UniProtKB/Swiss-Prot annotation:
Residue positions binding a 1,2-diacyl-sn-glycero-3-phospho-(1D-myo-inositol 4-phosphate): 62, 71, 152, 155
Family: Belongs to the GOLPH3/VPS74 family.
Protein name: Golgi phosphoprotein 3-like
Compartments, as annotated in UniProt: Golgi apparatus, Golgi stack membrane; Golgi apparatus, trans-Golgi network membrane
One GO term (biological process): Golgi organization
GO molecular function, a single term: phosphatidylinositol-4-phosphate binding
Gene Ontology terms: cellular component: Golgi cisterna; Golgi cisterna membrane; trans-Golgi network
Gene: golph3l
Residue segments, region Disordered: 1-30
Signal keyword on record: no
Length: 280
């Protein structure tokens, strides 16, 4: 599990799964960007973009968190698009990590990774928890019969989506013994917009209440932290603003997910994913 660090590190479903629950949160502005001129990115694309080295076009070789972070992004994205919900809270299942992910709709989203995950969920009986799905989609399971749920070549597939959207380009680089496909950032404006959004959410537009934050921004903060790429968004800040952003993000991410996830009109999947990563 990743931990927030100080300035010193800156350098470097079956039928039973289908539900018609009233407990899902209606998607207000998640489907449409608040600024229509911005390129529409999924949470997974935003996380990968934050993690990519601009010129080199690849993520840090030392980052072993981003794979599971991207899978968490898939679950939140499906929730925000009203494709899945968490089963209702009961006396026996009050904790977010105990509640199963239920399929609400298997209508295709148009995103290959999301739709592939929907097919897995539709074919899975009994339903699985958020933590189980992150492990299954990452391939971290000892059960050979469940290896079929692993999503393969996720980073490369997300990168290709970003290439198609004109944000990345594709190059071949030689690393002594092998050649590697890399994806340098070609549209720096889009990445700067993404970084600015995260910075402003913790500085100029700080609301000191996660339930008043834009849901996609809150989700990105959680996923970027879990993927160990959040600090990348703060590297351009002055020392004072950097410390303030890190302090506020730590306060936010240290909140109890079960408490926050059970508050009215909350996006419980975001807190469920955070809780799953806190346990891992």
């Amino acid at each position: 599990m990743t931990t927030l660090t100080r300035r010193g590190r800156r350098a470097d479903v079956g039928q039973e799964n289908r539900v018609d629950s009233e407990d899902y949160i209606k998607d207000k502005d998640e489907e449409e960007s608040a600024d229509s001129k911005d390129i529409r990115l999924t949470l997974m694309e935003e996380v990968l973009l934050l993690g990519l080295k601009d010129k080199e076009g690849y993520t840090s070789f030392w980052n072993d968190c981003i794979s599971s972070g991207l899978r968490g992004g898939i679950l939140i994205e499906l929730f925000l698009r009203n494709r899945v919900v968490l089963e209702p809270s009961t006396l026996r299942k009050k904790r977010l990590t105990d509640r199963k992910v239920l399929l609400k709709s298997d209508t295709p989203t148009g995103d290959v990774l999301l739709d592939e995950t929907l097919k897995h969920m539709k074919a899975t009986e009994p339903a699985e928890t958020v933590q189980s799905w992150i492990e299954l989609l990452t391939g971290e399971t000892w059960n050979p019969f469940k290896l079929q749920y692993q999503l393969r070549n996720v980073r490369e597939r997300i990168a290709k989506n970003l290439v198609e959207k004109g944000i990345l380009t594709t190059e071949k680089q030689n690393f002594l013994l092998f050649d590697m496909t890399t994806h340098p950032v070609s549209n720096t404006t889009e990445k700067q917009r993404l970084v600015k959004k995260l910075q402003e959410s913790l500085l100029e537009k700080w609301v000191n209440d996660p339930h008043r934050m834009d849901r996609r921004t809150l989700a990105l903060l959680v996923l970027a932290h879990s993927s160990d790429v959040l600090e990348n968004a703060f590297s351009s800040l002055s020392d004072e603003k950097y410390d303030m952003a890190m302090t506020r993000s730590k306060e936010l991410l240290d909140l109890d997910p079960d408490t926050e996830g059970n508050k009215p009109n909350t996006c419980e999947m975001i807190w469920a994913v955070l809780s799953a990563f806190n346990k891992s």
